[in-house]
Amino acid sequence: AIYTPSDYAMGFTEKRSVVTNAAVHKGQNYVFNIDLKDFFPSVEQGRVMKRLTLNPFNFSPQIALLISGLCSMRVKREQPIETKQHDLDKQFMYVLPQGAPTSPIITNMVCDTLDRRLAGLAKRFGLRYTRYADDITFSSMHYVYSGNGEFTKELARIINTQGFVINEAKTRLQKLGSRQEVTGILVSDKLNVTKKYVREIRSLLYIWD
């Protein structure tokens, strides 16, 4: 079977990019960005294995265990856990490695439910929603982004129940009239790149010349 990421996943899939991600949010009064903390290491082998046993893959548990193991790496837990299994299980866990070529598409697979629930939340509040890897964006013509409001509380609840944590340091609300940026693309009026990006490209061209 061929896997196709959700309509809201804009990264690491054919015919989608930072540009198509940004285009969804062009010309909105409010652009709300959040980041998922430690995105790839947050996905443990067990979650990958379970996903591989579901549609459209339907692998046997044995095959799913093998594939998920090949795509994971062992890391030490910050806090050992209580378990009846081998002592190593108390100290270590197996997670998706940052930078591995397999990790991005696997996170898209694992995040199917997250995308579906966040898209449902967006529809409920009349918002636009996309996700590019760990970079989540909502936008709208109206304001619903109060820190203690119903939308933000439900947003945090959904993300936490899906095994992720919001990186509060990277949360930002951008209003029309200020610089609105989505995955490095300016979206206030028309799609454009930032001056910083232009400077970086010029520097690279100078080095290569």
What are these model-derived regions, one by one?
Residues 181-209:
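Active-site and adjacent loop segments of nucleotide-processing enzymes
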Residues 174-182:
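Flexible glycine/acidic-rich beta-alpha junction loops that bind and position SAM and/or redox cofactors
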Residues 1-40:
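Active-site-proximal segment of RNA-dependent polymerases
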Residues 11-13, 68, 174, 186:
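Residues in well-ordered beta-strands of folded domains
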Residues 17, 101, 178, 187-192:
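Short capping/connector residues at structural and topological boundaries
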Residues 8, 92, 169, 178, ...:
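Glycine-rich, flexible loop/turn motifs
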Residues 24-133, 137-165, 171-175, 209:
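Conserved polymerase palm-domain catalytic core
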